[in-house]
């Protein structure tokens, strides 16, 4: 309800069914849900229960029954496009869960690493992104490293047991050293750095090995 000045009439913005738009807190993405003549607004990421309540006020049982319009508030273009794709191909719940993973990564100063790990895995569905964020400590990330020589230098710099005197540095074979490490793990040069995965396979992290075993057992 708004009151502009003395003598003006009250304007009732609440129709007793759906709350009006009111951005009372920070959000990453603003979502407008419509069904027939009713409209609800969500400020993502939010609690799953908040989405369910909004759907109930719309008279909908799931997000497929609504038209959804997203507006970027505090995400970069890359993540906004991903959230749009996930909302379209999966649902709003999945997109909301991915935004929670993004918030966790950003809080831990690991958003660049998460983006590189997603590039490494080449998986962009919500379940994969969430599993990759949950297991981000299993990956090694070298920011702004794009080739074998740079990787070799970065690997040596991070190891306190290694030291190369600047007088002989130009003679050290950094590429060959990087190759020896890459032979023992999975490695990919990504758009914003290099990612290494050691000790586990990507399939294990994504839970695909368990799925394969279940399918094999089911076929016996």
Where are these regions (language model features)?
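Conserved aromatic
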Residues: 44-48, 142, 171
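Long, highly charged low-complexity segments enriched in Glu/Asp and Lys/Arg with interspersed Ser/Thr
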Residues: 179-212
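Short, surface-exposed beta-strand/loop "edge" segments at domain boundaries and coil↔beta transitions
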Residues: 36-41, 76-78, 202-205
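N-terminal ordered "arm"
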Residues: 1-63
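Short, flexible beta-strand-to-coil junctions
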Residues: 32-37, 71-73, 198
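Non-Sec secretion/translocation targeting segments of pathogen effectors
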Residues: 173, 211-220
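Short, hydrophobic/π-rich interface segment
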Residues: 2-10, 154-184
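Mixed-charge (acidic/basic) macromolecular-recognition segments
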Residues: 55-170, 206
